[in-house]
Amino acid sequence: MAKDVKPTRKNLMQIEDRIELSERGHDTLEKKRDGLIMEFMDILDQAQDVREDLDGSYERAQRAINMARAMEGDVAVRGAAAALKEHPELTTQSKNIMGVVVPQIESSKVRKSLDERGYGVMGTSARIDEAAEAYEELLENIILAAEVETAMKKMLEEIETTKRRVNALEFKLLPDLYDNQEYIEQKLEEQEREEIFRMKKIKAKKEEEEDALAAEEEAEEEPEAVTADD
């Protein structure tokens, strides 16, 4: 790449400016990458807790529904589920984490009272109520897990993008610029040495010509001096 650059002082100044800008950009991206990794680790810790809660609530919901089916029968359980009139509502917002937009999911009407579940209190048992509560808890944890894991995915994508940009600067662009800078500096030094050598030759030649001219003038003056003595 360096051979494609003309070795001029103007190009050298432009490359030095690009190096300065690229080095600042590299430092900024490194700080961003490190900050993103720290944020990602915090979200990862949160995700592990959420995943444990989700697994636990799933097991509780399964036990509760199995118990309700065993005690009340599938028909009663399906009837209670079909009686639900108000379904959960979800709204999504967003927040910014170091330039990464991640979702925030707000849920409502997930947890319900006995009346809100739609089935008659007199026609069901506590086992069905326990199963309903367990699945409401499970749904809340599913929503939270979806939010956290989506944030993790977006953060990880941004980390990888930032890493690629850091590596492109560190291992491609900056080395090429340094090579170009070194190439131009070497060529300019060669040109300067050649110019100094050329000027010395001109000076030496001029001195030789001046010495020769002085010798000729001196030779012309000597016969005149001899004639005057005679």
From Swiss-Prot:
The family classification in the record reads:
Belongs to the V-ATPase D subunit family.
HAMAP family named in the record: ATP_synth_D_arch
Example GO biological process term? proton motive force-driven plasma membrane ATP synthesis
State one molecular function term (GO): ATP binding
For this record, the Gene Ontology CC terms, alphabetical, are:
plasma membrane
Q: Report quaternary structure and partners.
A: Has multiple subunits with at least A(3), B(3), C, D, E, F, H, I and proteolipid K(x).
Region annotated Disordered, chain positions: 204-230
Compositionally biased intervals (Acidic residues): 208-230
NCBIfam families of this UniProt entry? PRK00373.1-1 (NF001542), PRK00373.1-4 (NF001545), V_ATPase_subD (TIGR00309)
| Membrane topology according to the record | Peripheral membrane protein
Q: What does this protein do?
A: Component of the A-type ATP synthase that produces ATP from ADP in the presence of a proton gradient across the membrane.
Where in or outside the cell? Answer: Cell membrane
One Pfam family from the record:
ATP-synt_D
UniProt keywords (A-Z) are:
ATP synthesis, Cell membrane, Hydrogen ion transport, Ion transport, Membrane, Transport
Record protein name field: A-type ATP synthase subunit D
